[in-house]
Amino acid sequence: MTILKRVLLGFLVLAGLFMTGCGPDTIRGKEYPINDEKTVADDADLSIDERVQKIVDAMSDEEKVGQMMMIGIQGTTVTDDTRYMLNQYKAGNIILFDRNMQSQEQVKELTTDLQKENSAKVPLFIAVDEEGGDVVRMKNDLQAPPSQQAVGSSGNPATAKDYAFSVGMQLKGMGINMNFAPVADVSATDSRSYGGNASQVYKFVDAAAYGYEAAHIMYGLKHFPGIGRSAVDSHEASSVITTSKSELFQSDLIPFTKTMASHDTTKFVILVSHLVYTGFDAEHPASLSWPIITDLLRNGLQYKGLIITDDMEMGAVTGQHSFRDLGVMAINAGADIVLICHEYGHEKEVYDGILAALKDGRIPRSRVEDSVKSIVKIKLLHLNEEINN
């Protein structure tokens, strides 16, 4: 038996354990406190769009901006700083890192407390990066999958589906409702990619998507429109991709476009990279680019789901603009949620910048309303599903 098969067998056994322990009397209905006081989701005579409109109409500007942010927090419990960000800055979404995660039991308690502390009428998205290989959380407490490169080299897309299902079940059991995976980049050398052939990468991304959907957890395709060609780590510095638009469509974009065409786009998000793609926009990184986010992804490819930026604290963008401006630029480019992963001060600057721009008209109110409606609708559709299934 190969190492990959042995690891996969362990994953399937673990998934079975999670399935037997996660029935209606355990995580469903407790992780996400949707109830009469929190939402109007039980207004049976209203359509989903009417419910969404009712919730959004009742939101303040501050609450709307909070829904358009996903922030990192410090500590393994709900600290005073975290409580302040949830209640004063109305943060609507959280991303967790190893600094927040010590054990499955502790994470479940943390996510439950975060949802209880959440003052919004809809639950928090609580996300992690659990790709496999080197990019995993709680490596010593969870059965981490191998790298996507290793999975891709197996030649069997069903393997990707099984790993995604197992990871999804583990995360859901801890109250995490979104995983920023699979990586849809095309690269023959990057261990985070399923491979260097775009059609092969799509088959594995497609299979992984079905795995996450079977586990009833949101997932995120990244890093649009593809960072497989870059030799520079965008955590550290900016990078420019000079590949032509037509070549990007014939290769790098295939895993994204085909997955969008074959899956319900309300069940996943697309995370946009910080690279510059001169074929689409020679001036702005993708995360701040109207031609890429709105013209290409939203209008050209007709993507209806949520668009999230990569972390705004990465070196690829921090040297170019202030944090107050970065959030404004991302929202005006068409992003629905701005990701800021580490420093409370930076998170506050991004929030303050977006709120000020909304109030003085630099961000059109319709731009914010459209995003918040999409966020609320997807939360009602899929986080509420965890209770009702």
Regions found by a protein language model. Name each.
Residues 68-78, 148-162, 238-251, 313-321:
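Active-site mouth loops of central-metabolism enzymes
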Residues 5, 21-89, 300, 319-389:
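Preference for extracellular/luminal or secreted protein segments
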Residues 60, 102-116, 134-136, 196, ...:
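Second-shell residues forming the walls of enzyme active-site clefts
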Residues 115-143, 163-183, 209-225:
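Glycine-rich, aromatic-flanked loop segments that form ligand/cofactor-binding clefts
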Residues 1-8:
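Bacterial N-terminal signal peptides that target proteins for export
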Residues 148-209, 213:
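A substrate-binding/cap region within the structured catalytic cores of diverse enzymes
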Residues 10-18:
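Bacterial N-terminal signal peptides
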Residues 65-73, 92-96, 124-130, 178-181, ...:
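Hydrophobic faces of well-ordered beta-strands that scaffold small-molecule active sites
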